[in-house]
């Protein structure tokens, strides 16, 4: 997601975005408490969306990155997405059950329970680094809980964003789930909609702006933000094993992962052996260097710099 712009005036809100939101909000008002068979059906359709179109998904993500091996997309996005859906299908009906909770003796013989209820329309802002998984994961949570969901895809993955929009339109009615695409202007307008919950994955700087925009509507926000991820190597830990494991995490997706190791903390006397082993491990993993098709490309020049 790019830097966000000035808040929009009500009349400046993109018509299709506003219409998509209003459609879902009206649908939820008419049917606020969906039953498990309906939720299960939506999850099953989401699973088919991924499994039936896996090869095309891998090709479009490869095109957006300018080179990302299919096996990496499978391991990091396709399989985790299917696992999320299958987990919700296994447990979703149980999650809907009321939960009895303790009541103080001063309130006896009263009884109390927690009753799970849908929120309404859930907004999801998806980043570019794992565009499939970071769209599917939040959608699973929204749909299994009985919500409607509106998803804003990243402008940095235009081919996949267009494909995902087309697939969601194929497998879902617009009042169930919908996708919007566009630049920072659309992202700003999206954040200003009065969602019942908003989920954002991206940078800390943009996360602040998303939360500020949502605050005008008192929209609850879940932020999953980037940061620095240190790795610590204990004095007694084998250097070669440490280098192998750290490089595996760092080089996955060319390091374009929010939890990819950023730096290593280790005893001074282990620095040179670690650097030597890390270089050797990188050569073993990618012997052709940048010419190796198994190494993911950086998504664009801006992020490379």
Task: State the predicted function of each range.
Residues 14, 18, 33, 40, ...:
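Electropositive phosphate-/nucleotide-binding environments in soluble metabolic enzymes
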Residues 28, 32, 47-50, 54, ...:
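Structural signal for hydrophobic packing residues in well-ordered secondary-structure cores
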Residues 18, 44, 86, 136, ...:
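Amphipathic, non-transmembrane alpha-helical secondary structure
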Residues 105-241, 292:
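Rossmann-like NAD(P) dinucleotide-binding subdomain of oxidoreductase/dehydrogenase enzymes
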Residues 2-113:
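N-terminal Rossmann-like NAD(P)+-binding subdomain of aldehyde/semialdehyde dehydrogenases
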Residues 205-305:
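ALDH superfamily catalytic-core signature
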């Amino acid at each position: 997601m790019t830097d966000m712009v000035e808040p929009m005036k009500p009349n400046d809100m993109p018509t299709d975005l506003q219409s998509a939101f209003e459609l879902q909000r009206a649908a939820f008002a008419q049917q606020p408490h969906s039953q498990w068979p309906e939720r299960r059906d939506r999850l099953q359709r989401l699973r088919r969306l991924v499994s039936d179109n896996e090869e095309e998904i891998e090709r479009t993500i490869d095109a957006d990155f300018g080179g990302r091996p299919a096996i990496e997309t499978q391991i990091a996005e396709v399989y985790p997405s299917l696992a999320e859906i299958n987990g919700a299908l296994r447990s979703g009906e149980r999650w809907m059950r009321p939960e009895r909770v303790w009541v103080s003796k001063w309130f006896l013989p009263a009884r109390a329970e927690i009753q799970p209820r849908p929120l309404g329309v859930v907004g999801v802002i998806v980043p570019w680094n794992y565009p499939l998984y970071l769209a599917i994961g939040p959608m699973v949570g929204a749909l299994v809980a009985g919500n409607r969901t509106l998803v804003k895809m990243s402008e940095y993955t235009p081919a996949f964003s267009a494909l995902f929009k087309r697939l969601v339109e194929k497998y879902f009615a617009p009042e169930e789930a919908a996708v919007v695409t566009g630049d920072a202007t659309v992202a700003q307008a999206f954040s200003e909609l009065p969602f019942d919950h908003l989920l954002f994955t991206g940078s800390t700087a943009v996360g602040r702006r998303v939360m500020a925009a949502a605050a005008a509507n008192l929209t609850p926000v879940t932020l999953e933000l980037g940061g620095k991820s240190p790795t610590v190597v204990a004095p007694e830990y084998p250097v070669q094993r440490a280098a192998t494991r750290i490089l595996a995490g760092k080089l996955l997706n060319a390091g374009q992962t929010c939890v990819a190791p950023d730096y290593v903390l280790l005893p001074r006397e282990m620095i040179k052996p670690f650097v030597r082993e890390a270089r050797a491990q990188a050569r073993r993993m990618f012997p052709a260097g940048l010419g190796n098709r198994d190494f993911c490309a950086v998504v664009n020049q801006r992020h490379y710099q």
